[in-house]
Amino acid sequence: MQWEVVIGLETHAQLSTASKIFSGTSTAFGAEANTQASPVDLALPGVLPVLNKGAVERAIQFGLAIGATISPRSVFARKNYFYPDLPKGYQISQYEIPVVQGGTITIQVEGRKGEFYEKTVNLTRAHLEEDAGKSLHEDFAGMTGIDLNRAGTPLLEIVTEPDMRSAAEAVAYAKALHSLVVWLGICDGNMQEGSFRCDANVSVRPLGQKEFGTRREIKNLNSFRFLQQAIEYEVQWQIAEIEDGRKIQQATVLFDPETGETRAMRTKEDAHDYRYFPDPDLMPLEIDASWVERVRGELPELPVAMQARFVSQYGLSAYDATTLTATKAFAAYYEAVVADAGAANAKPAANWLMGDVASQLNREGIAIDAAPVTPAQLARLLARIADGTVSNNTAKKDVFPAMWAGEHGGDADAIIAAKGLKQMSDTGELEKIIDDVLAANARSVEEFRAGKEKAFNALVGQAMKATKGKANPAQVNELLKKKLG
């Protein structure tokens, strides 16, 4: 039997406000345990929550960026459950009327054969809520500690429709969402610190069946790799269970990175188990049209708009445009290179950024802002490739690594001169070298004339070797073809 995977994601993005959502306490990460927990965060008697306007503005920004509806009136509700790191015994969230409704995010997904396809993921909602504290299970022998510094940190919970059909689609969506919230500046996106974490709702059903299967929710996935591994394992587990004649039970599960497996944590609750009701301590949130329009006017150029511009203005593919706009800084670097190198170098600039530059950044674990090669320096190198001063191969193998290492101040011209890397420009000298190569490789000449194309490549290789790689490969090809008739 063929199976179809159905996936929906719930993502918690910590909003980048200086203070918590209902108190003035700092949200700075890394403070000593329980030093950033006010009476409001601790749920002490006689205190009332006060909504952080900055958190609301960030929610509006996100809603506008995904083309969603901003609710003119939304309501905060109490989500009732008991857990040691939840001091009040309830979490302030939004239930019936969230601040953001609907919206879409378009993603580029890599298929099984390496091709890319586009897909639009529909969002159900995004709502404001407070984060819980943190349980410290490994800090005390035989006991669990509680750190309430995180309690009350503003969260935007972003919920999709069950639109994704593979782990690859889920990861592509999570990466696109991560890129967007960081681009907007509403979340720092630090997954190691828990600023951006995903819950995946996964089910399977026979291919062609309309009804959804029973879902299991994988909680707190804080890396894209774990998200992919968890979904892939869970899918295979569910299929095996059904094929063995067992029923899937709705449950909340955890992913163990050590074993690569999911394991049930508890029976999955439904909304009625949380006994939602409007929080009597908070007035309904009212957002008028003028507030929304002011926020709209302050939005930066969004990734989707920039991607469309890169395709139309620079002739890039949709995949290239998406890759180059992964972060605002990466996109800005690219545009700075093209501004210096000219529009004719738009595609080569994209190739260099996605190739050699990205490889160096990944190897050293640094962001584009910290790259030792400036946009102007890379533009100069592209110009030298374009005018034939150096070949693309020499630029990659010899010039760029020296620029990255800071040799000669990262100046491409100085490095080319110092290393003697300039391509041969004397046609007469090159013709003489090719004549010598043909004379010394009579057998290859005969094989080529007998129809063996590989022999021609061998002659090109000998010519490049004789010039120590300084000849222009295109010119070598042209002269060889001319002389071989």
UniProtKB/Swiss-Prot annotation:
Signal peptide: none
Family annotation (Pfam families): GatB_N, GatB_Yqey
Gene Ontology molecular-function annotations: asparaginyl-tRNA synthase (glutamine-hydrolyzing) activity; ATP binding; glutaminyl-tRNA synthase (glutamine-hydrolyzing) activity
Intrachain S-S bonds: none
GO term, biological process aspect, one: translation
HAMAP family: GatB
Family to which the UniProt record says this protein belongs: Belongs to the GatB/GatE family. GatB subfamily.
Protein name: Aspartyl/glutamyl-tRNA(Asn/Gln) amidotransferase subunit B
Gene of this entry: gatB
